[in-house]
């Protein structure tokens, strides 16, 4: 988890500071879901070029990432790994990440705006769910960029551990290339076993393993000797 809190540039106490919250990586078959919360001082100049992270090029996201972390009064980035996703389910894992992200900036923010139509339970401050918020609210746009860049960087690091899957290119999404690699190599520890394509692959692996074991037993010397004894008895 990454966080920052700028104590030296807090505005006056009567300024309504709002945290923008968004996630990246709910849909991929591998890797974490990442949630970010960002708080800006509304009295300061805006960062030019903010937008929904999905509408920006990787280079543009990286450039804006640097501006956001430099200018934010506070930000928090939370990573929920694939094991937690499989344990909780992706929805609950995302809600957990959102709650932790808001908690990370609650000492600054008086409220939060969260992209989507659902709010996590037990938030430390009042919150509003904003459908399409990553295209409507600048703090949510900033949060979407922090979450996306953080996750993309992490997937590039995972590629170094698991080079067979191409995580550096598709970032864990179920592209044809990823599905082909999954079929050839099977899932790794970073794959989400609760997601249908991965679960199906694990089922196929288990079937093949049982078939191989059965075939091995049928051809083993012990099995052959046992069959000979049966034939003699006949």
From Swiss-Prot:
Its main location: cytoplasm. A divalent metal cation binds at residues 22-23, 115. Keywords: Cytoplasm, Endonuclease, Hydrolase, Manganese, Metal-binding, Nuclease. It is found in: Cytoplasm. The keyword Nuclease applies. Its cofactor is Mn(2+); Mg(2+). It comes from the Bacteria. This is Ribonuclease HII. It comes from Xylella fastidiosa (strain 9a5c). The gene is rnhB.
């Amino acid at each position: 988890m990454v966080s920052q809190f700028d104590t030296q540039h807090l505005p006056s106490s009567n300024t309504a500071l709002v945290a923008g919250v968004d996630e990246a990586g709910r849909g991929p078959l591998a890797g974490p879901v990442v949630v970010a919360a960002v708080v800006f001082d509304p009295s300061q100049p805006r960062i030019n070029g903010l937008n929904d992270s999905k509408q920006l090029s990787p280079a543009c996201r990286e450039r804006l990432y640097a501006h956001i972390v430099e200018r934010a009064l506070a930000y928090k980035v939370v990573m929920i790994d694939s094991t937690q996703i499989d344990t909780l389910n992706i929805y609950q894992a995302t809600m957990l990440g959102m709650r932790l992200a808001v908690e990370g900036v609650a000492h600054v923010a008086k409220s939060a705006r969260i992209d989507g139509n659902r709010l996590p339970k037990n938030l430390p401050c009042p919150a509003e769910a904003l459908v399409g918020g990553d295209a409507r609210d600048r703090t949510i746009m900033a949060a979407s960029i922090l979450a996306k860049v953080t996750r993309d960087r992490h997937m590039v690091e995972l590629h170094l551990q698991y080079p067979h899957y191409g995580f550096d290119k598709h970032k864990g999404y179920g592209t044809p290339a990823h599905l082909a690699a999954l079929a050839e190599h099977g899932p790794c520890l970073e794959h989400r076993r609760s997601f249908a394509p991965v679960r199906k692959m694990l089922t196929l692996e288990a079937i093949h393993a049982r078939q191989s074991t059965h075939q091995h037993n049928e051809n083993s010397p012990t099995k052959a000797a046992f069959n000979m004894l049966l034939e003699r008895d006949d």
